[in-house]
Amino acid sequence: MTKKVYHQYWFWYLAAFVVFLLDQGSKHWIEAAFDYNETKVFTSFFNFTLRYNPGAAFSFLADAGGWQRWFFTIVAVAASVLLIVWICRVASSKPREAFALSFILGGAVGNLYDRIIHGHVVDFIVVHYQDYYWPAFNLADAAISLGAMVLIADLFINPDKTSGEKPTNA
């Protein structure tokens, strides 16, 4: 592995670490500044409300009895290892993909940390329209979503040139 490639994938790992730090810093701040379920309204469609989510996205399995903490921990660890390897493989050749993966990795590790340390994920960002409220989320969730959107957009912007080719027999 060349020195240039080595530095490129470490750049993306550093980006993931920055996402993790921003996520954890925001969660630390919200827990210090707010009581549970306390709301601060910023606009007619955006507010902060401190909430705890023992489940996954959209509180999936939040009331499952406790086993979900370790199940989602194992899933997050496996996904993080996969993302670390994937970033290493694409760091020098696909920077947009590496960017997306680093945001997903940083967000995944941020929520993983919460789940291991607190037994739940700290959520606080609430977006709504009139009486319809999107489930509360955090910066880690936003980073994961942004990374996923960039990956999907990249599929359309740069389709794999080999996807339409038939494999050749050697």
Swiss-Prot record:
Reaction(s) catalysed (UniProt annotation): Release of signal peptides from bacterial membrane prolipoproteins. Hydrolyzes -Xaa-Yaa-Zaa-|-(S,diacylglyceryl)Cys-, in which Xaa is hydrophobic (preferably Leu), and Yaa (Ala or Ser) and Zaa (Gly or Ala) have small, neutral side chains
Source species: Cellvibrio japonicus (strain Ueda107) (Pseudomonas fluorescens subsp. cellulosa)
Listed name of the protein: Lipoprotein signal peptidase
Lineage top rank: taxon: Bacteria
Alphabetized UniProt keyword annotations: Aspartyl protease, Cell inner membrane, Cell membrane, Hydrolase, Membrane, Protease, Transmembrane, Transmembrane helix
Transmembrane segments: 5-25, 70-90, 98-118, 137-157
Alphabetical list of InterPro entries matching this protein: Peptidase_A8
Pathway: Protein modification; lipoprotein biosynthesis (signal peptide cleavage)
Enzyme class: hydrolase
Described function: This protein specifically catalyzes the removal of signal peptides from prolipoproteins.
GO terms for cellular component: plasma membrane
GO molecular function: aspartic-type endopeptidase activity
Topology term for the membrane: Multi-pass membrane protein
GO terms of biological process kind: proteolysis
HAMAP family: LspA
Gene: lspA
EC number(s) on file: 3.4.23.36
Keyword Protease applies: yes
Chief location category: membrane
Active site residues per record: D123, D141
NCBIfam families named in the record: lspA
Family statement drawn from the similarity comment of this UniProt entry: Belongs to the peptidase A8 family.
Subcellular location: Cell inner membrane
